[in-house]
Amino acid sequence: MNGRRNFLKTAFATCSLLAGSKLLTACTPIKKVATDEETFETFATPDALKGMPIKATFLDEISWDIPHQNWGTKEWDQDFKAMKKMGINPVVLIRAGLGKWIASPFQCLLGKEDVYYPPVDLVEMFLTLADKYNMAFYFGMYDSGKYWQEGLFQKEIDLNMALIDEVWKKYGHHKSFQGWYLSQEISRRTKNMSKIYAEVGKHAKAVSGNLSTMVSPYIHGVKTDQVMAGDKALSVKEHEEEWDEILNNVNGAVDIMAFQDGQVDYHELYDYLVINKKLADKYNMKCWTNIESFDRDMPIRFLPIKWEKLLLKLDAARRAGMENAITFEFSHFMSPNSAYLQAGHLYERYCEHFI
């Protein structure tokens, strides 16, 4: 029995040392202690692509389909530190709630919706960490998961209007609170859907002194669930026509547009990004790209993406003139602290490329 206990103690101690050593690996140079550790040649090819750097990330703690890592404040502090070293700023809370699950005890939702009372105030925690590391924080809205999908757009709007008022009153004093994220993700022209973006976005800006608003819709391409189930993918021309109409409806309510980049094939991406930039310029929006750092090509949902695939997308974004790159998302798929070993390796490859 004692032998078993000693074995477990040794094993856990080893795991802790490994986790600690992963955290020290970061893109910002740090003072190195002289060791006998062997260095290795990367064998990089001479004409390898040159991507643009990732400068922002989503925070996916109220998750749709990504497993939770069950982090507390200590673990999140370590991850914010790793983000900062990689040059990430801002961080964007992808949503304040989804269905019954909410990020903080929002009274406007607890009083009207059938939601669970949360054990942790995630918004206060994230804002406190963003303050500590001098990072900007964008607050993501509540996604009912039902009203807007059922055509009850006004109900979705009213919930988020009340949420904006409560959140700004409670958390607006934080220096890091610098923007809003409109969480409902759409791809094609949906009747009255743009009304949510317009009304909620304008209200958020009015309440907060014109802080920036951001959306991250997806392209109706070959890798969307709908197309893989038999629907027809949008051509580049169709994508331009439909989003020209949507953006015209939300003009003045959205400042940053960051299309998700994972629903089209790698060789198609550049053409869609060029159109996205053209549309953003037309409507005086900043054009970012949402670089998905998870792999849609695998049969398992979802694992960290292969470095070569990420580099292909970063290069396409650079050539298309994207103004910034945000990833979905660092903590699961790129962090040296992630539960996925591949994420730490992706972080290493990324740092080798950009340092």
What are these regions, as identified by a protein language model?
Residues 1, 23-48:
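C-terminal segment of N-terminal export signals and the immediately downstream linker at the start
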Residues 1-4, 21, 112, 202:
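Intrinsically disordered, low-complexity regions
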Residues 6-28:
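N-terminal export signals
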Residues 38-355:
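Glycan-processing catalytic domains of CAZymes
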Residues 12-13, 18-19, 35-38, 213:
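N-terminal functional modules and adjacent low-complexity/disordered segments of proteins
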Residues 4, 8, 28-31, 102, ...:
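Generic low-polarity alpha-helical segments
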